[in-house]
A protein has these predicted regions:
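Terminal non-domain segments
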Residues: 38-82
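Residue-level detector of solvent-exposed, low-hydrophobicity positions
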Residues: 18-19, 32, 75-78
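Short glycine/acidic-rich loop motifs that flank beta-strands on beta-rich extracellular proteins
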Residues: 8-14, 28-34, 51-55
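Short "repeat-start/strand-capping" segments in structured domains, especially the N-termini
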Residues: 15-19, 35-40
Length: 82
């Protein structure tokens, strides 16, 4: 997905190989990328919450919260701020 706006509750969960380029997230989005793997995401702006991503990389200007709970299937995702 290129230059798209993501909205909704728990978006982009259970995905494999998702590519996001210059996308934005609505502030109401929470628990993004849960159980997703091989993520390649370049986000413009902020992500409210990322929950239990398995692997890949997520870059954003701001991340409000990163959650790994007891149900996390992996912790190999690299989350960076720009």
């Amino acid at each position: 997905l290129v230059r798209c706006h993501i909205s909704g509750e728990q978006p982009l969960c259970y995905m494999d190989g998702i590519i996001l380029d210059d996308c934005t997230f609505d502030a109401a989005c929470d628990r993004c990328f849960e159980d997703s793997k091989n993520i390649n995401a370049d986000i413009v702006g902020a992500i409210t919450e990322i929950k239990n991503p398995i692997s890949g990389r997520i870059a954003a200007h701001n991340v409000g919260k990163v959650t790994y709970d007891e149900f996390a299937k992996g912790k190999q995702a690299m989350i960076t701020l720009r």
